[in-house]
Amino acid sequence: MAHKKAGGSSRNGRDSESKRLGVKKFGGEAVLAGNIIIRQRGTKWHPGANVGMGKDHTLFALQAGAVSFAKKANGRTYVSVNPILEAAE
C-alpha cells in the first residue's frame, strides 16, 4: 500500500522557552546586596570578592557596590563587587 507522510507541520513547530541567561549588571554598574549580576549554566564566570553563587550558578552581590570583571592567570573570569566607600559625616 502506498502511504504518504503528511507535510510535517503537525510534527514540528515546538520550541523551548528561552531561559533569559547572561549578564544582568555590567562592569562599573552599581548593585545592591542581593542583586543578580549573572544568570548562567555552569561556571563561565566565577564569584570573586563580595559575590555569592546560587545552586543554579547564578552570581549575586553580597554587598552594595560597583561590579568589576577580572581575568586571572588561570584563564578564569572572576566577578567582584567593590564596595562604595561613603565619606564619614
From Swiss-Prot:
PANTHER family noted in UniProt: LARGE RIBOSOMAL SUBUNIT PROTEIN BL27M, RIBOSOMAL PROTEIN L27
UniProt organism field: Chelativorans sp. (strain BNC1)
InterPro entries attached to this UniProt entry: Ribosomal_bL27 (IPR001684), Ribosomal_bL27_CS (IPR018261)
Membrane spanning residue stretches: none
Annotated GO MF terms: structural constituent of ribosome
Protein name, per record: Large ribosomal subunit protein bL27
One Gene Ontology term from the biological process aspect of the record: translation
Entry's family note: Belongs to the bacterial ribosomal protein bL27 family.
Annotated segments matching region Disordered: 1-21
GO cellular component, one term: cytosolic large ribosomal subunit
Keywords: Ribonucleoprotein, Ribosomal protein
Matching SUPFAM superfamilies: Ribosomal L27 protein-like
